[in-house]
Amino acid sequence: MNAKERFYSGLAKETIGKITSNTDNWTSFLRTMSRNYEFTYPEQVMIYAQRPNATFCKPYEDWNAENYRRYVKRGSTGIALFVMNRDKPYLRYVFDVADTGVRRSSPELKPWEVTPENRSYVMEAMERTFGVAADGVLEAQLEDIASALAAEYWDDYKKQFLDIVANSFLEEYDELNIEVAFKNAVANSVSYTMYCRFVESPDNYFEHEDFQKVFDFNTRQTVNALGTAVNAISTRMFQEIEKAIGEHEQIKATERS
């Protein structure tokens, strides 16, 4: 590992050591996660550590490609991410949309958005996919889905998680209370991440107590397990929402033609 890789490795460790230390740090990380859900949890940690306000990140070559036809502004600093799928980890770089400029031929960037027009379609699509009824309120439906998926995730990874609670605050709990803490921390964190994309001030919908269990994840292994779970579930949900909005737009376009 060269000096630059050691620096960024240290930055990642430092960030992981802080993100569950208080509510502000954790919710700040969740906001970054909500805007960058296409990335893995370790990549989201690196984005948060370097550019917590980043909203839409792509590699240099992608910005120049046909889909975006944008240029990266001179002097922009890339966000370093570790690539771990080789024998030896190495760094790659992405740039936030704020680092780019438009050309005359650049298409308009339109991030997906839940609107009054597509909200009902999104709720119906989420009910079809996850089997959780909407009852007219998307946010409540998403909270119920988050809870259901947190329970599924626990069932799938229970053994692995119980093996890593040593030296964390969770170590003092029996198995049942570890399960309760895990499901609570994951479900509330996923719900907050969802709210970040649907309401202007997600903090108005949550209390400090909603994240109390997060503080029990206070070792690197338990923080990583929590972050990985929140990433997996929220990404799955965001992808379904994005898909539903795309389908709705196609339906409306067909009706207009």
Protein language model annotation of sequence segments:
Residues M1-S257:
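N-terminal accessory/interface modules of nucleic-acid-binding and processing proteins
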